[in-house]
């Protein structure tokens, strides 16, 4: 009886850890969170229909040393904001 209970508890722990692992993998990053690729950012759109992308941004005319999930305003606006002031690369 005790052995069966232990086996059932072990199986339950394995199932919970598998489900929790899948949940962690499916989590995405919201706006302003650090990222390394577009796939890490949540598949959300703002009011203007812009999607979150993993971009290098500027802070007071200097490039940040990391990328963030930001709403992508289009190449022209990103160039104007980043390339003109601090020559960031997308």
From Swiss-Prot:
Claim: Membrane is one of the keywords in the record: no
Residues of the signal peptide: 1-21
Keyword Ribosomal protein: no
GO MF term (any one): potassium channel regulator activity
Function: Neurotoxin. Blocks voltage-gated potassium channel (Kv). In vivo, induces a rapid increase in swimming speed on zebrafish larvae, as well as death which occurs between 2 and 18 hours later.
Family under the similarity heading: Belongs to the sea anemone type 5 potassium channel toxin family.
Protein's name according to its UniProt entry: U-metritoxin-Msn2a
């Amino acid at each position: 009886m005790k052995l069966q209970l232990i086996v059932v508890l072990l199986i339950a722990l394995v199932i919970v850890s598998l489900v929790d692992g899948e949940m962690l993998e499916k989590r995405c990053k919201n706006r302003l969170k650090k990222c390394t690729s577009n796939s890490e950012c949540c598949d959300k759109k703002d009011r203007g229909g812009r999607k979150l992308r993993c971009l290098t941004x500027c802070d007071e005319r200097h490039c940040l040393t990391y990328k963030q999930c930001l709403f992508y305003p289009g190449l022209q606006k990103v160039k104007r904001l980043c390339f003109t002031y601090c020559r960031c690369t997308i």
